Design a protein with these regions (language model features):
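Active-site-proximal alpha-helix that buttresses catalytic centers in soluble enzyme cores
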Residues: 1-307
Length: 307
């Protein structure tokens, strides 16, 4: 994958650089899980993950909920991400459940946790149908498990760090791509739920601040614009050096279709990125502190998504 070098390198405007540095500092503060996985100043409210010395209860199990895919790489990616989560939080019981297409299915995972506490962390990027309806339905069908549902992964600055890292891997050079010809299309699955679209737009805005160039959300289904349409619109504005950021947690049909629009400038899905593992634990920590008798699951997800 070779990119042509511009005649004169462009740098991001000073304001964009300053904002990007501020966003990076904010990212580190918002994460309750430091990079080395040891407790830090932001971990004051986090309970130990092993049973307390006085025989106290263990931490709730973390159940990561993936969508599921016919692409075998999707399952391998989810398992690799959960390995990173375990590395960051030794002693925490981390399990996987799928909404469809792959085993273990979520009901089977919950069935193995009867009588226990669990926090469901959706490996999903916005407040769509699965988060609002499928997850609450699954917990209602498992009354023997004391469950809390975490917010979806997006939007959050840690997602932006993962997106940025994947773009750099695909050839994005911050020193060269800050000029008037550069832009990014944030390729997402798409949903008819307006909250999901809003979450994608918020992530696009955060990524634009991080990169210092326009970032346009586009969709593989159920919403507009499509990725090819977004690329054409950017080209009409003189933005010809356009990369596609893959706003998918794992490989799959939609991710591949979006990447095919610009195969030489398409980033990989978020996958098993260190920032993703930190974000999974951040969502887990926020949800485990919420009361079991709090708001209805869908309302609680909406509240937590802003954190």
């Amino acid at each position: 994958m070779t990119e042509q070098t511009p005649e004169r390198p462009h740098r991001s405007p000073p304001m964009a650089d300053s904002t990007a540095r501020l966003l990076t500092r904010t990212t580190d503060r918002l994460s309750l899980v430091p990079r080395n996985g040891t407790p830090g100043p932001m971990d004051r409210t986090r309970q130990p993950d092993r049973p307390a010395a006085d025989g106290g209860p263990p931490a709730p199990s973390l159940v990561a909920v993936a969508h599921g895919s016919r692409d075998p790489e999707a399952l391998r990616t989810a398992l690799a991400l959960l390995d990173l989560v375990r590395d960051l939080r030794p002693g925490l019981d981390v399990r996987l459940g799928h909404i469809e297409l792959n085993r273990p299915l979520l009901p089977d995972t919950l069935d193995g946790l009867r009588g226990a506490d669990a926090v469901l962390v959706p490996l999903l990027l916005g407040r769509g149908h699965h988060v609002k309806h499928d997850l609450p339905a699954a917990t209602a069908a498992a009354p023997d498990v004391r469950t809390r549902i975490a917010a979806p992964l997006g939007p959050h600055p840690l997602l932006v760090e993962a997106l940025y890292g994947r773009l750099v891997e695909a050839g994005w050079d911050p020193a060269d791509e800050g000029g008037r010809s550069a832009a990014v299309v944030l390729a997402a699955a798409g949903s008819r739920d307006p909250d999901s679209a809003q979450d994608t737009r918020r992530t696009a805005g955060l990524l634009a601040t991080r990169l210092g160039v326009p970032v346009v959300p586009a969709y593989a289904s159920a919403a507009t614009p499509t990725v090819p349409a977004a690329l054409r619109a950017l080209a009409a504005r003189g933005r010809h050096r356009t990369f596609v950021a893959s706003y998918f947690t794992a490989p799959g049909r939609f991710a591949s279709a979006c990447a095919d629009a610009v195969p030489h400038r398409a980033a990989a899905p978020l996958g098993a990125h260190p920032a993703m593992a930190r974000l999974v634990l951040h969502r887990y920590d926020r949800a485990r502190s919420a009361p079991l008798g709090g708001p209805a699951a869908a309302d609680a997800v909406s509240l937590l998504a802003s954190a």
